[in-house]
Amino acid sequence: MTRACPWIHLPEKQNQGKLVYIDFWASWCDPCRAAMPSAKKLCKEYINENIVFIYISIDKDYNQWVKAMEDDGLNTNSNNFLALNYPGSKMYEKLKLSGIPRYLLYDENGELVHQNAPGPSDGQISSLLDEYLQ
């Protein structure tokens, strides 16, 4: 749980002391899918850094989600999740998640530091992550 965003529960032991970058996406979202190659590149660029990349799909169709994961090469990432109860969940309401793609950044203390972080294809994301990794 985070103090700044108590409705999102991050696995504390697994992510303790790490930056956490969350990508909300869906199989039917063309901009989300177009950003996936950049997301994979960003993940590889920071593979030895103290950061966790989490992908949360708001798909309602499980099979479409699985196919998109396979097509985009996310099926090997253990931090890839299918959201439940979208859009009725309190989490989505609190985040005002009215559109995707949407990116969140939590610092190493579990505090939400960017509710609308730059996307993986945005040139600003690397400098932002580097700033928090120092």
Where do the model's predicted regions map?
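A short beta-strand-turn-helix
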Residues: 2-20
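Short, internal strand/loop/helix patches
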Residues: 3, 66-108
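C-terminal structured domains
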Residues: 14-15, 42, 89-92
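Active-site acidic short loop of glycosyltransferases
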Residues: 16-17, 48, 97
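Short beta-strand segments
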Residues: 23, 53-57
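Conserved redox-active cysteine motifs that mediate thiol-disulfide chemistry
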Residues: 24-41
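Thiol-/selenol-based redox modules, centered on thioredoxin-like
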Residues: 105-134
